[in-house]
Swiss-Prot record:
ATP binds at G84, G86, R87, K107, D119, G120, R170, R177, D256. The active site is at D246. The keyword Protein biosynthesis does not apply. It is an enzyme of class 2 (transferase). InterPro entries: adnlytase_SelO, SelO. Belongs to the SELO family. It comes from Shigella boydii serotype 4 (strain Sb227). Nucleotidyltransferase involved in the post-translational modification of proteins. It can catalyze the addition of adenosine monophosphate (AMP) or uridine monophosphate (UMP) to a protein, resulting in modifications known as AMPylation and UMPylation. The lineage of its organism: Bacteria, Pseudomonadati, Pseudomonadota, Gammaproteobacteria, Enterobacterales. It catalyses: L-seryl-[protein] + ATP = 3-O-(5'-adenylyl)-L-seryl-[protein] + diphosphate; L-threonyl-[protein] + ATP = 3-O-(5'-adenylyl)-L-threonyl-[protein] + diphosphate; L-tyrosyl-[protein] + ATP = O-(5'-adenylyl)-L-tyrosyl-[protein] + diphosphate; L-histidyl-[protein] + UTP = N(tele)-(5'-uridylyl)-L-histidyl-[protein] + diphosphate. This is Protein nucleotidyltransferase YdiU.
Amino acid sequence: MTLSFVTRWRDELPETYTALSPTPLNNARLIWHNIELANTLSIPSSLFKNGAGVWGGEALLPGMSPLAQVYSGHQFGVWAGQLGDGRGILLGEQLLADGTTMDWHLKGAGLTPYSRMGDGRAVLRSTIRESLASEAMHYLGIPTTRALSIVTSDSPVYRETAEPGAMLMRVAPSHLRFGHFEHFYYRRESEKVRQLADFAIRHYWSHLEDDEDKYRLWFSDVVARTASLIAQWQTVGFAHGVMNTDNMSLLGLTLDYGPFGFLDDYEPGFICNHSDHQGRYSFDNQPAVALWNLQRLAQTLSPFVAVDALNEALDSYQQVLLTHYGQRMRQKLGFMTEQKEDNALLNELFSLMARERSDYTRTFRMLSLTEQHSAASPLRDEFIDRAAFDDWFARYRGRLQQDEVSDSERQQLIQSVNPALVLRNWLAQRAIEAAEKGDMMELHRLHEALRNPFSDRDDDYVSRPPDWGKRLEVSCSS
């Protein structure tokens, strides 16, 4: 089957990119590819059998027209000016059978006009982390970019030490970022901001294109998508680590996996990025930061959208987030209905977990073992303060009995929303260290395991982290 590519970005937004081709690595070789995703995108298996090829920037497929995008943004709350694709190149937009498109974005593809002081490269460590994280999030049901392939090489890339240069093929319906809009707003080119909005509406919100109120309705949906995404992050214990405006997806996708981390111990103020000295992007601050970023996006639209309309959309953020979050957290607790005491029970559990540094994922997963008419619970052994747990658990069982459903029904609900497996940093690190020694088996094993996060397992993928794997330091270095 021949793949078809279109050039919408190149044709319709001529001042938002620089056309250029990837710079190949030395002795590039394909070490992993996403068979399931490739099948979904109707990519012939033969493309993965002819060396690095397009996956390593050594060839282009017919119809591809590579370019690097320019955008700007606020980083750690401070205006950073022009940024852009410093090491990534959009190879093309694949046209799918249903008329939608999928960006093919090659990360680590070499120098671009937007590399600033960088070298345009990515290292094997960061490409493995992003591939694992994006696929883990996908199978958790959270909107995200996807990973299609990883190429390693003999080209050294210098970070803290010399590391193998690598490339990641990332795919997504769009790489539109808040930062695209900021770029032209701060250059006082509001008409180009409008062109970006029209482009987004035309291709991703086409049902609004002929509506006279399209900009307000569109921005309201961007707010809702963002609120929903953040609610989902919070419920699975995911910390992004670098929520700069240039890393915010207009479509509400999880974008740009860098120093991310999933909670091990329940620590509301968890900071996964060791460069985040002030804790701006801590786990519990993510909802507020996302709203702040939406406010920056709203500012760029103010020359052609009524400020009252923008503020009305922004005002809806909190309620949308709380609605999604509350619904999912009730499911995580096994509640089939909504009752007035639900929030208090959840907050009391969180307080107990925070005091005892309980494992976030294991605690919620073990709730499925609760029998509503039994005072015994395997979860009790997870807590030191048994009296405090017993007090909470008695009220929790009483709440379960209000729903009048069987233990098996409730267990099925809890296990469908509380994963047994999340991508803990130590699991990723183990796969990385093996891969850097030339052993790709753990990378493939872990990818396969992450496809079934809600299935029970009896291996160390679902255990607490070993001592060496606790609080691994992760930075923006990639």
